A protein has these predicted regions:
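Intrinsically disordered terminal and processing segments
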Residues: 1-63, 67-128
Length: 128
């Protein structure tokens, strides 16, 4: 019985340590990404074509192709998404950028850091 309690205690301690590690991982880079400043882009100076951009910051790292046609954002394709990607957040953000034709949009509620990371990679792609 004593050995069973020791095993249970060690397993419980292991679960607690893994849990704290996971919480640390989730919060790492959160503040710096949430506080990013995203600057609007002047589409009138961009030629037609595909532009590649990225944002690198831990679990918020992502990569994107942005297609410009007739000085308008025609398509946005994230080929490397953030860790713990929520497709509905990404799609809503893409649609908002396509509708407004700018990255100066409100972030998606409850996904501010993810939204900012995606917007920053689009900005980086289109920044001359």
């Amino acid at each position: 019985m004593k050995n069973v309690l020791k095993i249970v205690a060690w397993v419980l301690l292991g679960v607690i340590i893994v849990g704290f590690g996971f919480i640390f991982f989730l919060n790492k880079d959160l503040k710096s990404t949430t506080n990013l400043q995203v600057t609007p882009i002047d589409l009138s100076i961009l030629e037609d074509g595909d532009y590649e951009g990225y944002y690198e910051n831990g679990r918020f790292t992502n990569r994107v192709y942005v297609t410009i046609k007739d000085h308008k954002i025609f398509d946005i394709d994230f080929y490397k998404t953030v860790d713990f990607d929520l497709p509905e957040v990404r799609e809503a953000l893409i649609q908002a950028v396509l509708d407004k034709q700018n990255i100066d949009i409100d972030t998606i509620s409850e996904a501010t850091a993810t939204s900012k990371a995606y917007l920053k990679s689009i900005e980086q792609a289109l920044r001359p």
